[in-house]
Amino acid sequence: MSASDLTSVQAGAPQGRRQILVTSALPYANGQIHIGHLVEYIQTDIWVRTMRMHGHEIYYIGADDTHGTPVMLRAEQEGVSPKQLIERVWREHKRDFDSFGVSFDNFYTTDSDENRVLSETIYLALKEAGFIAEREIEQAYDPVRQMFLPDRFIKGECPKCHAKDQYGDSCEVCGTTYQPTDLIHPYSVVSGAAPVRKTSTHYFFRLSDPRCEAFLREWVSGLAQPEATNKMREWLGEAGEAKLADWDISRDAPYFGFEIPGAPGKYFYVWLDAPVGYYASFKNLCQRRGLDFDAWIRKDSTTEQYHFIGKDILYFHTLFWPAMLEFSGHRTPTNVFAHGFLTVDGAKMSKSRGTFITAQSYIDTGLNPEWLRYYFAAKLNATMEDIDLNLEDFQARVNSDLVGKYVNIASRAAGFLLKRFDGRVQASAMNHPLLATLRGAIPQIAAHYEAREYGRALRQTMELADAVNGYVDSAKPWELAKDPANAVALHETCSVSLEAFRLLSLALKPVLPRVAQGVEAFLGIAPLTWADAGTPLSPEQPVRAYQHLMTRVDPKQIDALLAANRGSLQGTAAAAEAGAANGNGAGSKNGKGAKAAAQPAASAANADDGASPIISIDDFAKIDLRIAKIVACQAVEGSDKLLQLTLDVGEERTRNVFSGIKSAYRPEQLVGKLTVMVANLAPRKMKFGLSEGMVLAASAADEKAEPGLYILEPHSGAKPGMRVK
């Protein structure tokens, strides 16, 4: 169903009962769930709840991704078996998902009999169809532990920016991708020994087969997100270009996973059996509920299948996975929905670096999970844009929207209705024009949710809440209650308020399911569905005593959350200041220290051994620092360092500035951003043109030891041309 189709969906209208299978990416079973993970599970859960409220047959499936070298080594470090480790982690993950209201129909494990059988079946079907190749490859080998090393188990010095302790496939500092053999001074993270090269027989899925390319070109054209389609087309290349490489689907013993049939000592690579785990989890559910599993996965199935994932695993879900399914005789996904990454107060989260806020720490500090569900939903849309958890904004938005605008409507009306009118609404009040407006908006809000435009759904809902509060403030029930002669008007006001509250609760139910349960109990009504928009409260059913549905965020709770994750967040700040690229070139100036996380950390820039000379305030006043908006940005042909920025500085014309930040940013990342520039720097004639100023960037003092480069961004509200003083 396209986005345009979704907007025509009418809440409660007969759409036909759809059969839908939905998955989120499988969390890896060697670590904790953090709030970055929760973006995806909350996004998926809201969509699933939306579809359940339409009455569709929908199943939300998940599992722990349990196989691979990291799990094997983690278990060894803990002195337990891999199976013991994954069983414990499963319980922890299930606890966290339950805490945040993630309503899986089945949360399973990829280390299951169902998954082994399905993985073998798919592999053998691909082999029979000629899609499996066998060849010798050379790999890194740990001579001490006598094991082949995955790329992420080799570290060394980045060949480009020379950052230390970088992984064997990509640099977390400058973003460069490379082969493990490109690392300078590589070492095994398992034993510390220098890896040697050794050959082994491996098995490959022939993604380069012309049949795969032809199928994938057609399949990716149907993806819902244009940016996903464009990225896949980049990887596919032009017709005849043959950019797709065969995919290594095997690993050597020792390895925790499923052994490949007919290949002793060889195991399925985790990325083969992990997506099959979606089907394995669903098969387990089907066996328990008596559902026809084959009817959902066979090639001619009329059911729908959607995968919600992070944009970092698009490659696996839009190339490997659909090709595996197509050529093993199964149905392919209806669509794949990718989301962006989460930052916390502007800093990128990194699980491998331990820089994340755990789900459990959020719960342990007494924060309401539905606050986070609401905040994430307010920022989510149907694109792959990154979202930021700004903790000050989080507190302000929850307190203003959920407490100030929403639950206070019920608290203001319920007392009068119970005390004066036996808890029963006025029947004639259910026809009030304000309620007609709310009922008319419900179908559009439901359509926004289905189109994954959660931010739009919540903005519309809060606009309606503003209208309801305006009505209450105008009617002044607290004044009406002072005079018995106003009883009819008071009854109408309270009745309209509570019916409006019911409708707002309906609009918010996919996001706030536990609050919705409380509302349903308070109003004495059945679980709300979209079809209930036109079924108002009845005088025959008195409301119950009002119980507080939600409290305000206490700043002390935020402080406790930061304290619980202080080491992690300081690591984020340190990583940001130890950053990415070398050499700033003309038009870019290093500043000292850049706030990168919610929790302050010792700045690398503050450790500068060579102190800058002291200047007077008059010296500083000579520098005209201005807010600038980057309206255009492009790479400079012939330069590996420079980007050409077109800046709006609030003047009648734009300015042209060359900045040496190409190693840290792609042009499209900068367009639309605000930054800070030196506006009164003398223009400089360069090889590539005239540079009319300088943008500011932060980096560490010793750029070779701690490379990194970060442009400065002002807070929202700053405008082009404003002076920085």
Swiss-Prot record:
A single GO BP: methionyl-tRNA aminoacylation
Enzyme class: ligase
GO function terms (MF aspect): ATP binding; metal ion binding; methionine-tRNA ligase activity; tRNA binding
Signal peptide start-end: none
Cofactor remark: Binds 1 zinc ion per subunit.
Keywords associated with the record: Aminoacyl-tRNA synthetase, ATP-binding, Cytoplasm, Ligase, Metal-binding, Nucleotide-binding, Protein biosynthesis, RNA-binding, tRNA-binding, Zinc
CDD domains with a match to the protein in the record: Anticodon_Ia_Met, MetRS_core, tRNA_bind_EcMetRS_like
Gene3D superfamilies registered for this protein in UniProt: HUPs, Isoleucyl-tRNA Synthetase, Domain 1, Methionyl-tRNA synthetase, Zn-domain, Nucleic acid-binding proteins
Domain tRNA-binding: 619-725
Subunit: Homodimer.
Name used for this protein in its record: Methionine--tRNA ligase
GO CC term, one of those recorded: cytosol
EC number(s) on file: 6.1.1.10
Motif ('KMSKS' region): 348-352
Keyword presence, NADP: no
UniProt subcellular location: Cytoplasm
Catalytic activity field: tRNA(Met) + L-methionine + ATP = L-methionyl-tRNA(Met) + AMP + diphosphate
Binding sites annotated in the UniProt record for Zn(2+): C158, C161, C171, C174
Short motif 'HIGH' region, span: 27-37
Pfam families linked: Anticodon_3, tRNA-synt_1g, tRNA_bind
Cofactors required: Zn(2+)
Chain residues that bind ATP: K351
HAMAP family reported for this sequence: Met_tRNA_synth_type1
Family designation: Belongs to the class-I aminoacyl-tRNA synthetase family. MetG type 1 subfamily.
